């Protein structure tokens, strides 16, 4: 349908809203006109002469933009005005359109809320098609060019129509039997017969009666029943397959059916349909032979993908989905019926010209833009302010994780002690020894679990700032030892384990009689301490003591992120010492407990960057009775519980020991011991650990509700009116915005907010086309191209700057595509990628085609580069490749994470250093760089070598694309590199013996390619090689790739297949190779084929040199061509590169 010469009714124009990705030119043309008309109502009321002057200006503006609008200009010049109140008529219609837009948001939000609770995953996209109020009839709007409409969820089929069958289809005011039919190419697909006398509605699909409604209008309600019981609604899909045959499906809350020929086949789910096709052939391009009347609700196109889980039966899923659609349709009908009827009657009472139709479309889009503005994120400056002075003991914010196992009885430490034996004759024997300690039941210990809330205020958020202190690994058996902290005779606090032997105040007796429990034979120490002490865990040389702060930004649009302009400071006060830290805030995304995506302001500061700590002492008990003895604990017996390892002490009379009186050695009696559990550390009194510590070591002591640094309490402090300045996008309406994939927000946001410091909202540039073009050109500068590549779903970014109307459509479909975390719900990610591409490709092509880029800039818009979060690994990826022709198989190597999609630059050893240690070191270093385990020196070395393109290895590029075709995954890998595969020939000839065949061979280094294509089998992870003809390679190229001379006699098909599979095997064996660069770039349709052609016509211009033009330079050029549309000028001609771009455009 050309525009606007063949526009015969509003119906033709408003079809544009049905499927935006397939109406690129028409939408952009209309959009561009909209940007040039500021006051449409005022124009409509002008005199004929004034209107002609305005129309002439509009035509000149369109011509200046260079848009392909010749037909529109001619129609505008011939525009005739009629004296009628068109403004009021079109205003009514505009209101109806705005209701449609708002209620589409309602549907999106309603769908989103219901999907959160599903165990399976249902992905539904809704496109509203606006019914015309100014047509001769009110028939269903099935498009003329349906064959060109892509079904974005199933590339084997194209949806012809999808409609809801229910009581809303019936005119209850009639007294005659009514037949309503959907007819395609003279075939009756659906027929509804309504019998007013009995209030029965029968529905038949391809001649078979499907169900019968018994309708009741009592109390203005409709009771719906079919033969199987309660029924909500019926959804019918008609799709045309690639072979031109029509398949028909029906979905109800009870079952899913597929109709084959003249009978139906029941299925329990949407998975595993019969592969048969019906007999309905489509022989005509015009399928608008429709005889039914649809009143009230607008036509809805619904696409559904559905992944079932065992925990959630399909009938419940479908019932929930269909009930929700039915409810949404009812809402639409109630809201819009009267508005449509009013507009319809007003339009039919007056005469409209084609120019009126054009004007009406402009008003329609203005209302859509108003809706976009109301729900589009606005770039906003905000300042978070600390309301009051905040000072608190640092321990109040401490949160720890107890990592001791419940059965822990590990040896925690040993102390140096001296053992004293005294007999009745005052003979004293002193010997050196060790006391060993078994861990108490630390798994049951209550550890710190605190946080502090700091009051803040801001323009858009009034949430509090949450402060938490983390000490990773502090309560972990692998990291800590057990020790005693006590005051020595000189009032210096130190660890008992560090006492000199002469200063030890722990004494052994002869072995006590513990014959009743041999399991604690090692725990037999006697302790006598004259001073207060503390028992705890010691963590030596800690690396981290993290202070985290977070504040949730409720008003922020989560898909766009933000950037922090300046941070504030906080301080630690330790007595008279003050240590200042920068908060280092950033904006990150997260998902709350309800499943809603949000943004929050976060800061993570390691306090040990300025606070020197040699050891952290975490008190687990203080002055527990009998554990540490003081003067008041004489003659106290404390023992052991044989069922739980713990430690205990036995007390002796201090005077007797000190005076060496003649006495009998005290032998502990047998008794029933009680378990000595560590006390709750949060309730301990820290007074006993404050004081003077032994010099030479910095100890941080955590005791109860206080933290001490070398005996002095540590406090956190943040001053009143401290400011944190930031920018982020807010969502005024609270409706869903574009959120199609999980993006790296922190990378995107800084660039988005720096596009234009004066850009405060999308609205500020909607009506200024030139400003939008200038900003886009600025964004496309080479220095910024890499950053722009990640900004693909920014409503306030390039998409809306270039095409505001597209942004409005994306608002509708984007919120549904990102219903929930796809990984969590097991969705097939390829379906989401296909849907996402449909509008990305539109943005790419439309902007290039209509000259919104500079004329001398050959790059396509790199919106097509999907960010890291959107390219997920496929559920079925090639881990094993079966080669049936040569009866072999290949198990993929260690780099399987990179074989689903994207571009790899793979390196392998060239043996330049022989087989010595240097060659081995290079291989090991490459492996570490690939795995992310390399140290700084190794990373820097490889980074330098890669930057200069002199890594002592061979590099080749793997362009990888995985498509899902029905239930089959097709994996295509195009290998490109110097002397790779079938490389380009030049003027060097080789003569075979007998001079029977002369073959050109490449005897110099040059670019080459090989395309390996495999498809999934019924075994997950197993792929097999396809027929070699599907690769697009010739027989000669396959033989060249294998290093074989092409035979004198043309080889058989099977022989070529064997050679093809042997090359796949060689290429697929990736052990001892390393992917040092990976680009998550998804190829546009036709891009790989266009790239192949570009290499073929350009490779002979590539002049190989060991330095400066080697395999690594070529790999870098290939990545630039594919991911950035960057032309390597030294070996690719400009005309060839333009043809590469044009080929992709034509394919799109």
UniProtKB/Swiss-Prot annotation:
CC per GO annotation: host cell cytoplasm; viral outer capsid
Catalytic residue list: 954, 1111
A molecular function (GO) term: peptidase activity
Domain PPPDE residues, every copy: 930-1148
Pfam families listed in its UniProt record: Peptidase_C97
Subcellular location: Virion; Host cytoplasm
UniProt keyword annotation of RNA-binding present: no
InterPro entries: PPPDE_dom (IPR008580)
Record keywords: Capsid protein, Host cytoplasm, Outer capsid protein, Virion
Family: Belongs to the phytoreovirus minor outer capsid protein P2 family.
Function: Minor capsid protein present in the outer capsid, which is required for adsorption of the virus onto host insect cells.
Stated name of the protein: Minor outer capsid protein P2
């Amino acid at each position: 349908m050309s525009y606007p010469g063949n526009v015969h009714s509003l119906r033709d124009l408003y079809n544009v809203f049905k499927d935006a990705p397939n109406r690129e030119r028409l939408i952009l043309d209309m959009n561009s006109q909209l940007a040039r008309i500021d006051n449409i109502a005022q124009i409509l009321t002008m005199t004929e002469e004034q209107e002609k002057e305005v129309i002439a200006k509009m035509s000149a503006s369109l011509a200046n933009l260079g848009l392909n609008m010749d037909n529109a200009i001619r129609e505008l010049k011939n525009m005739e005005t009629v004296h009628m109140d068109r403004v009021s008529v079109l205003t009514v219609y505009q209101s109806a359109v705005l209701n449609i837009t708002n209620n589409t948001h309602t549907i999106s939000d309603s769908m989103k809320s219901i999907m959160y609770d599903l165990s399976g995953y249902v992905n539904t996209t809704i496109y509203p098609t606006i019914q015309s109020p100014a047509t001769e009839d009110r028939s269903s709007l099935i498009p003329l060019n349906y064959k060109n409409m892509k079904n974005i969820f199933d590339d084997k089929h194209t949806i012809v129509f999808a409609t809801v069958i229910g009581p809303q289809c019936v005119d209850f005011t009639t007294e005659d039997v009514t037949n309503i039919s959907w007819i395609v190419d003279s075939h009756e697909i659906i027929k509804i017969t309504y019998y007013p006398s009995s209030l029965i509605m029968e529905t038949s699909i391809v001649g078979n009666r499907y169900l019968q409604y018994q309708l009741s209008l009592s109390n203005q309600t409709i009771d719906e029943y079919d033969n199987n019981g309660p029924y909500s609604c019926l959804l019918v899909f008609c799709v045309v397959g690639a072979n031109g045959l029509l398949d028909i499906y029906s979905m109800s809350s009870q079952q899913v059916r597929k109709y084959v020929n003249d009978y139906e086949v029941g299925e329990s789910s949407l998975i595993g349909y019969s592969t048969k096709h019906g007999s309905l052939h489509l022989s005509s391009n015009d399928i608008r032979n429709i005889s039914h009347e649809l009143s009230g609700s607008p036509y809805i196109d619904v696409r559904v993908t559905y992944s079932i889980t065992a925990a959630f039966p399909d009938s419940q899923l479908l019932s929930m989905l269909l009930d929700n659609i039915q409810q949404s349709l009812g809402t639409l009908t109630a809201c819009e019926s009267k508005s449509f009827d009013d507009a319809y009657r007003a339009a039919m009472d007056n005469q409209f010209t084609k120019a009126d139709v054009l004007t009406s479309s402009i008003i329609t889009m203005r209302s859509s833009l108003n809706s976009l503005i109301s729900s589009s994120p606005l770039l906003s400056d905000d300042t978070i302010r600390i309301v009051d002075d905040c000072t608190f003991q640092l321990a109040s914010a401490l949160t720890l994780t107890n990592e001791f196992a419940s059965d822990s009885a590990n040896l925690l430490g040993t102390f140096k002690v001296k053992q004293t034996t005294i007999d009745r004759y005052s003979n004293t024997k002193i010997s050196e020894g060790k006391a060993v300690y078994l861990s108490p039941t630390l798994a049951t210990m209550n550890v710190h679990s605190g946080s502090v809330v700091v009051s803040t205020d801001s323009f858009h958020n009034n949430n509090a700032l949450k402060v938490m202190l983390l000490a990773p690994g502090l309560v972990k058996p692998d990291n800590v030892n057990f020790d005693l902290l006590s005051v020595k005779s000189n009032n210096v606090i130190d660890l008992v384990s560090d006492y000199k032997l002469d200063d030890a105040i722990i004494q052994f007796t002869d072995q006590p009689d513990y014959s009743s429990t041999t399991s604690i034979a090692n725990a037999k120490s006697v302790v006598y301490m004259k001073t207060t002490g503390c028992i705890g865990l010691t963590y030596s040389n800690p690396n981290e003591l993290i202070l985290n702060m977070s504040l949730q930004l409720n008003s922020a649009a989560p898909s766009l992120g933000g950037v922090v302009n300046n941070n504030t400071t906080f301080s630690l006060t330790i007595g008279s010492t003050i240590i200042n830290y920068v908060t280092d805030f950033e904006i990150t995304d997260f998902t709350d407990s309800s499943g809603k995506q949000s943004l929050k302001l976060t800061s993570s500061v390691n306090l040990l960057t300025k606070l020197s700590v040699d050891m952290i002492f975490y008190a687990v008990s203080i002055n527990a009775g009998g554990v540490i003895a003081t003067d008041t604990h004489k003659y106290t017996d404390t023992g052991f519980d044989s069922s739980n390892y713990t430690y205990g002490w036995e007390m002796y009379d201090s005077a007797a020991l000190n005076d060496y009186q003649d006495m009998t050695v005290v032998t502990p009696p047998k008794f029933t011991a009680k378990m000595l559990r560590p006390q709750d550390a949060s309730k301990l009194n820290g007074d006993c650990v404050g004081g003077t510590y032994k010099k030479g070591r910095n100890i941080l002591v955590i005791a109860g509700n206080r933290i001490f640094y070398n005996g002095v309490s540590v406090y956190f402090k943040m001053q009143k009116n401290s400011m944190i300045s930031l920018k982020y996008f807010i969502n005024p309406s609270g409706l869903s915005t574009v959120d199609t994939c999980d993006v790296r927000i922190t990378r995107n946001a800084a660039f988005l907010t720096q596009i234009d410091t004066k850009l405060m909202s999308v609205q500020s540039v909607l009506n200024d086309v030139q400003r939008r073009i200038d900003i886009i050109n600025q964004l496309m500068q080479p220095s910024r191209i890499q950053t722009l590549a990640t900004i693909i779903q920014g409503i306030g970014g390039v998409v809306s700057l270039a095409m505001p109307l597209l942004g409005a459509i994306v608002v509708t479909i984007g919120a549904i595509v990102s219903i929930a975390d796809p990984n969590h719900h097991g969705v097939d990610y390829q379906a989401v990628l296909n849907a996402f591409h449909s509008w990305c490709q539109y943005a790419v092509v439309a902007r290039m085609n209509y000259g919104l880029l500079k004329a001398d800039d050959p790059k396509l818009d790199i919106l097509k580069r999907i960010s890291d979060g959107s390219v997920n690994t496929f559920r079925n990826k090639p881990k094993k490749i079966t080669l049936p022709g040569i009866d072999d198989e290949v198990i993929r190597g260690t780099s399987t994470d990179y074989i689903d999609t994207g571009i790899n630059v793979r390196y392998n050893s060239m043996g330049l250093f022989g087989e010595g240690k240097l060659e081995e070191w290079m291989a090991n270093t490459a492996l570490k760089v690939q795995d992310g385990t390399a140290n700084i020196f190794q990373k820097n070395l490889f980074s330098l070598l890669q930057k200069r393109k002199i890594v002592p290895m061979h590099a080749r590029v793997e362009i990888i694309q995985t498509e899902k075709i029905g239930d089959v995954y097709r994996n295509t890998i195009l290998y490109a590199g110097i002397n790779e595969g079938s490389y380009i020939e030049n003027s060097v000839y080789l003569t075979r013996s007998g001079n029977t065949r002369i073959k050109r061979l490449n005897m110099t280094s040059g670019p080459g390619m090989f395309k390996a294509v495999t498809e999934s089998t019924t075994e997950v992870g197993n792929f097999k090689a396809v027929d070699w003809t599907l690769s697009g390679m010739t027989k000669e190229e396959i033989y060249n790739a294998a290093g074989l001379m092409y035979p004198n006699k043309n080889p058989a098909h099977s022989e070529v297949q064997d050679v093809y599979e042997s090359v796949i095997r060689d290429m697929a064996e990736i052990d001892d190779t390393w992917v040092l660069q990976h680009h998550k770039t998804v190829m546009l349709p036709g891009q790989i084929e266009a790239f192949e052609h570009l290499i073929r016509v350009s490779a002979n211009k590539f002049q190989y040199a060991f330095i400066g033009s080697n395999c690594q330079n070529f790999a870098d050029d290939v990545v630039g061509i594919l991911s950035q549309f960057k032309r390597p000028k030294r070996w690719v001609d400009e005309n060839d590169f333009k043809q590469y771009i044009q080929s992709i455009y034509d394919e799109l």
